[in-house]
């Protein structure tokens, strides 16, 4: 890329992402949530079971799963009652115990961390019986206060998948596909440089990888990831390590990869972009750390492009009745 083009591209990105009249970035940007979960110190000090509890900051999901499998029902219940925050957010803990620990936050809540803007994951469908699992990874401005939209997308995808399964007589309704709305990372907030860099996406990719490792540790099938907008940056960075059968991106500013080969994954890559999506006006470049690179719907990228002509806007890819949601459901059910 010529020096002039680099300068012009940087100027365009700065104008789009910092100087927009829609808002201004905060001076410091968002801080990715890190550090031990609340209650970790009490958890590690608990010797009531006469055995060492797994360290939430260092134990792998597989190690956590093995630990809980060796406990009696009474011992498991004691940990849920005494340490709900740790049990409810520890990847590798059985699904039913996480639900119980997170019950004050709602039904079928798989993770709930109220620190900062808050992180949450909620399940639509019967996760413990599901033959297929999907995870929706949202983009910017999603946290506990704005989570309802992502939860609605999960419910709509699950409903479409159930309709498809019923029509194909593949599985009983409700058992075939479960969809997890995963707001499990700190997303960019407002208009600003966080949208143009991979800083928050890198932290999100680590969290997503651990989350999917946790699903695998409790015996669930490898999920299909549905990654919206900035969430597709998260999925792109997670691709080499994440346990997924499919990665589906929509309204994507780029995945920080030149093509599917650069993603270094065995997962199938799908992409959708509506002609009415404003993301099409964002330059698909990466210069000096700004921008997220190639358009996943471009022919050179190599993803399988899904229909999206009837999607009316950037945040409408899961709208019932659209060809895009129909295609998403086929992927979620394992039909494509």
For each predicted feature, which ranges?
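Soluble periplasmic/extracytoplasmic beta-strand elements of cell-envelope proteins
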Residues: 134-136, 181, 226
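Generic recognition of flexible, low-complexity loop/linker segments
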Residues: 109, 119-124, 213, 235-237, ...
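Lipolytic serine-hydrolase domain surface
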Residues: 127, 139-143, 148-155, 160-164, ...
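Hydrophobic alpha-helical membrane segments, chiefly transmembrane helices and signal peptide h-regions
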Residues: 7-25, 205, 236, 272, ...
């Amino acid at each position: 890329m010529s020096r002039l083009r680099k300068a012009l591209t940087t100027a365009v990105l700065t104008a789009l992402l910092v100087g927009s009249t829609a808002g201004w970035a905060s001076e410091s940007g968002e801080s990715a949530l890190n550090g031990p979960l609340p209650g970790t110190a009490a958890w590690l000090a608990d010797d009531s079971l006469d055995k060492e509890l797994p360290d939430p900051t260092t134990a792998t999901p597989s190690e956590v799963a093995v630990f809980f499998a060796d406990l009696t029902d009474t011992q498991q219940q004691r940990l849920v009652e005494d340490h709900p925050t740790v049990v409810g957010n520890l990847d590798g803990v059985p699904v039913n115990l996480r639900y119980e620990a997170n019950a004050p936050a709602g039904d079928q809540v798989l993770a709930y961390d109220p620190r900062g803007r808050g992180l949450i994951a909620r399940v639509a469908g019967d996760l413990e019986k599901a033959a297929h699992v999907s995870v929706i990874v949202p983009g910017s401005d999603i946290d506990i206060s704005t989570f309802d939209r992502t939860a609605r997308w999960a419910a709509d995808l699950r409903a479409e998948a159930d309709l498809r399964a019923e029509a194909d007589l593949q599985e009983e309704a409700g058992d075939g596909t479960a969809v997890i709305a995963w707001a499990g990372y700190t997303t960019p907030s407002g208009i600003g440089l966080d949208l143009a860099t991979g800083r928050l996406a890198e932290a999100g990719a680590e969290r997503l990888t651990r989350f999917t490792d946790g699903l695998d540790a409790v015996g669930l099938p490898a999920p299909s990831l549905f990654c919206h907008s900035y969430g597709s940056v998260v999925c792109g960075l997670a691709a080499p390590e994440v346990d997924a059968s499919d990665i589906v991106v929509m309204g994507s500013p780029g995945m920080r990869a030149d093509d599917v080969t650069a993603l270094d994954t065995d997962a199938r890559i799908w992409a959708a972009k509506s002609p009415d999506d404003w993301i099409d006006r964002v330059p698909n470049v990466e210069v000096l750390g700004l921008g997220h690179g190639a358009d996943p719907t471009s022919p050179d990228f190599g993803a399988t492009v899904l229909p999206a002509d009837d999607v009316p806007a950037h945040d409408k890819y899961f709208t019932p009745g659209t060809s895009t949601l129909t295609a998403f459901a086929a992927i979620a059910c394992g039909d494509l």
